[in-house]
Amino acid sequence: MKLNVNLPRKPYDIIIEKGSLSKVGQWVKELWQPQKIALITDNRVGSLYAEKVKLGLEDAGFEIVVFDFLEGEASKNLTTVNKAYEFLLKQGMTRSDGIIALGGGVVGDLAGFVASTYMRGIHFLQIPTSLTAQVDSSIGGKTGVNTPLAKNMVGTFTQPDGVLIDPDTLNTLGKRELIEGMGEVIKYGLIADVELWEILKDLDGSTDSILENAEKIIYHSCNVKRQIVVEDELDNGVRLYLNFGHTIGHAIEATAGYGKVMHGEAVAIGMVQISRIAETKGLMLQGITEKIEAMCLKFGLPTDYSPWNVEPMYQALKHDKKTRGQMIKMVVVPQLGQAAINQISLEEMKEYLEK
């Protein structure tokens, strides 16, 4: 399966194919001339796939160096970025060379940020290995790292030269890591793809049902993301729809401590909680929140977070990129397959969270 992200400045393809990791050398050679490549990964994914990818690229004529870091959201910071810069400099990486991100969302976000800022930008490719990264973070060009106060607060818009998705990599994920990716998948069905929502309704919620339908799930999700990014690359309009569940979700991630609550889990909680607020305000059809919660619970995703720690969450919301003055943009789903943007005051949001 192939999807094209047809951006005027930099179009690129998303390849979705089981077993495609075995063809990585051929894929990269079609995009880049033989050169030096830094493979950026984390210690867990690196132990599984780095050698296979390295050998495939070397067989295609590339010189490969590998930079890895400790897995997890806690590593997605400027300290790790600086270590990557030092590594690239010591390896003699130049602007004609490239970086490949091999891993989940943390790896992709961090490697993309490094690629976009090292020497003011070098070539970059994404090979996402987690469900969250395959359906969401590897597409669209957002890169970034966290600060102690807020998630993805430092970042760039930098499109990759291509995205290679091998659904077989999902087989090596732990149960929790696979399930958390369904938070983003459910989001896509809710904001723009009723057909995807119906596919999810037919699944029994087991990990086997996710893996058996992975290509279909990934394709639908990537297609929604692709269409939205092409319409609004720089996040000034409809791309905000992709933040459904993320406002409260990011606040939970920041206040719980990065990595304690996984991203897709936080998104699931955020979707349910923001929908409860929206239904109370008459911004959504009655009963949609119940459907969202039931879908999340079916796949084993959390829908509530305790303790709420409302004051730290309130402080995190104040730093959210959607906050303007004392108001914050709130993405809601008026009906299934449709998203809308409303505003709510930070104080009103705090009052709802305290209930």
Swiss-Prot record:
Q: Which keywords are on file for this protein?
A: Amino-acid biosynthesis, Aromatic amino acid biosynthesis, Cobalt, Cytoplasm, Lyase, Metal-binding, NAD, Nucleotide-binding, Zinc
Q: Which domain of life is it from?
A: Bacteria
CDD domains linked: DHQS (cd08195)
Q: Which residues bind NAD(+)?
A: 71-76, 105-109, 129-130, 142, 151, 169-172
Q: Could you state one GO biological process linked to this protein?
A: amino acid biosynthetic process
Pathway(s) the chain acts in: Metabolic intermediate biosynthesis; chorismate biosynthesis; chorismate from D-erythrose 4-phosphate and phosphoenolpyruvate: step 2/7
**Localization per record:** Cytoplasm
The similarity comment for this entry is: Belongs to the sugar phosphate cyclases superfamily. Dehydroquinate synthase family.
How is this protein named in the record?
3-dehydroquinate synthase
- Record organism: Streptococcus mutans serotype c (strain ATCC 700610 / UA159)
